[in-house]
Amino acid sequence: MVVFQNKALNPVALAISVALGFASLQPAMAEESQDKADETVVVYGNPLYGMAPSEETGGYSVDSATVGTKTPAALKDIPQSITVLTNDYIEERNFVAVDDLAKYTPGLRTMVNDSGRSSIFSRGYEYDEVNLNGLPSPMQSKYGNLPSLAAVDRVEIMRGPSGLFNSTSELGGVINMVLKRPTEEFSGSVTARYGSWDRHYLEADMGGSLNEDGTVRGRFVVANADIKNQVDYNDNDNGTYYGTMEFDLSDTTLLSVYVLHQTKDIVPTNGLPAYSDGSMLNVSRSTYLGSADDNFNAKTTDVGASLQHAFPNGGVGQISARYMDHDMSLEQTYTNGAVDADGNTGLMFSAQANQQKNAAFDANYSQMFGLLGHQSEFVVGTDYKRYESDTQSYTNRKFASINVFDYDPTSVTTPTYSYTSNVHEVQSELGLYGKVTWRLLEPLAVITGARVSWYDLESTTTTISTGAESSETDSFNGKITPYAGVVYDLTDEHALYANYSKVFKPQTSQDENGDMLKPREGNQWETGVKSSLLDGRLNTRASVFLMKDNNIAAQAYDDSGIAITNTYWATGKVETKGVELEATGYLTQNWMTMTGYTFTDIDEKSGDHNSKFDAIPRHSLSLWTDYHLADWVQGLHIGGGMTAVSDYSFTKNGVTTHQGGYALFDAAIRYDITDNMQATFNVYNLFDREYFYRVGTTTTFNMYGEPANVMAGFTYKFK
C-alpha cells in the first residue's frame, strides 16, 4: 500500500478520471496480503490519507486534523479552535447521528428535533454546511440531510469562520466528517444494541485486501438504527449502506472511491405549545400532539472520489470530487397557537418535498520549502460547489381544534392536499485559494492566506395553480477573503496562537428597490494557548474570541415608524465574545477524558432581535471520563459524565419561554470479555432530571429532554 509522510515536496499537475464500483470482499486474501507487509512503499506527502485513522490509533485524542487547513497539521499548530471526536469516543457513547454527538461536544449547542434533523450551533451560529472528506454539502436540519456516523472514522469540528476554504459558510465554523477507510488486512465487526423505548442498533462492518498483493482494498458497512425516544408515536428508523475502495495505482499514486446511501423513515414531532404567557404545559414527557399518520421520508446517495499523487522529488497534489442526491418528503401536523386556560389550541398541517443535487470539487497542491534554515509550507488550490434544489410546499393553517389534555393522535388524519408553490434554487461558488505557513524562526510560524470567490444565486418561486413566477438573482465576482494566524511554541508541548478569519454570507432579503442586500460579513479574532502532552495523547486548549457579524438584514420602516412589508436594510450588527477550555485524551495510561467549558456572550448591537441567540446558554460544561480498572479487573472500564448549562430562553412577539440551568449525569460500564468480544451498558440522565432541552414559541418547539434511559450493547470483532 502507499504510505504518505511529511517531507519536502515539488509541484505536480494531476488529472483524474474515475469510475465507481464495489466488488465483493475477499477475506481469504488477508493472509496473503500479510506476507506483503514488508513491501510497503513510503512516499513523501501531506494528504488526508497520510493520517492514521482514529480507529487504529485508539483513545479519545488524535495528534492532527485537516479541518480548516486542507492538509493535515498538528492540532497545536492550527491557530483556531479544533475538536476531534474519535471512533472510540463515538462508539463508547453510542452516538448514531452527528446531532446526537453535538449535544455532548464542548462549545456546541443542539436545537433538538428528531435525531438526524436537529440544528447544530457554535458561538451562536448554525452550521449550514457539512464536509465529507473535506468536500461540502448543505446541512439543513428540516430536510434531514445530516449524515449518520456508522460510516465515519472521526468528526473534526472547527469553531469560528472558515473563510479560506468555506467563504460563504456561517460564522459558527465547519464540521468535517472523515469516512472510514479500507483495511489492508481482513478485519470486521458486528454490533448490536438494545435500549429503552425499544431502541435498537445493528451494524456489520468488514474490510480487507481484494487482491494478493494488497494494492486493492475495500470496506463495506451496513447499519440500521431505530432511534425511538420517550415521545409516543415518534418512530425514527435510519439505514446506512457504505462501500469504499482504495487502489494503489503505483507506488506513489492512490485512488479512493466511495458510495454512501442513507435512508430515514420518521414519525416527526414538533414538540409542545405553551400558555400565552410563556409558561410550560404540565403534561407527560411522552405527550405527542401530531397525527399518527405524520411521516418524514428521506433518501440520500453520496458518491465521492479522490486521486492523490506524490513525487520522490517533492510535491503532493490531490483532486477530489463529490456528488450528493437527496430526496425528502414530509407530512406533519402540529399545534399552531398558544394553549388557553382550558387546554384548547389548534392544529395546522404542513406538507413539503425537497429534491437536491449537490456537487463539490477541489484540486490542491501542497509543498514544503526551505526558508531561513527552517521548513515552511504552502498550499494552493481551486474549488467549486453547486447546490441545486426544488422545494414544494403546502400549508393548512388551522384544520382542527384539540384539547392537549384529552387528545388522541389517531383521531386526526392527513388531509387531501396539493402543493401550492415550488422554489427552485441554484447556488454556485468558484474559488481560488492559497495559504503559506512561514516558519521564520524555529519556534515561530506565521500563517497567511487569501481566497478569491465568484458566487451566483438564482431563485425562482412558482405558484403552481397559476404558473406565476417571481425570481431573484445575486452574484459577487472576485470577492477576496483574507486569513492570518500565528503560532509561537513556548516549549515542545505548549504553544500560543492567534488568528484573524473572515467570511461573507449572501442574503436573500431585498431592499426598497427590490435588490438583494449586500452580504453579511463576519470577522473573528481569536487567541489562546494549546498544549500537546504525554506524547500527543492529551490535547488541551484555552481560548478567547471576539466575533463581529455586520450587514444583517433588519426590518425597514417608513418615516412614521411603520414597518415596510417585505423590505429590509443591511443595518443589523451582532458582537459575540467568549472563552473556551478543553481537554481531550489520556490523563494517565488507563484514564481518558473529553471535557470542555464554554462561556458565550452575544450582544445584538442593532437590527431585529434574533430569538435563537436567547437559546444559547452563556455557560455550558461537558465532561466525560473513562477509566480502565486494569489493576482490579482486566478489561473492565467505568465511565461517567456530566453536561451542565445555565438558563436559556426564547422570545417572540413579546412573550418569553424559559428553562432554568440544570446538570445531567450519565454513566457507562464496558467489559472486554475477550480480545474480540465486548459488552457495554450505558445509563443516560441518571437521576431522571425533568427539563426542556429546547424552548420555542407559545405555538410549538418546546421539547422535553429524555428521561432516564438505558442502552445495552455487544460487539464482536473479526481479526
Give the residues covered by each predicted segment.
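Acidic/polar loop-and-plug regions of large Gram-negative outer-membrane beta-barrel proteins
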Residues: 225-229, 242-310, 323-356, 399-425, ...
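Outer-membrane beta-barrel translocator/receptor signature
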Residues: 150-153, 164-243, 249-253, 301, ...
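C-terminal beta-signal and adjacent terminal beta-strands/loops
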Residues: 643-651, 670-719
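Gram-negative outer-membrane beta-barrel transporters
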Residues: 442-443, 569-652, 687, 713-717
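Structural signature of Gram-negative outer-membrane beta-barrels, strongest in the C-terminal barrel
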Residues: 246-250, 260, 356, 375-377, ...
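Face-selective signature of the C-terminal outer-membrane beta-barrel domain
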Residues: 303-326, 348-462
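Short acidic/polar hinge/loop motifs at secondary-structure boundaries
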Residues: 110, 119, 135-159, 178-179
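Membrane-embedded beta-barrel scaffold of Gram-negative outer-membrane proteins
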Residues: 306-312, 316-332, 489, 495-497, ...
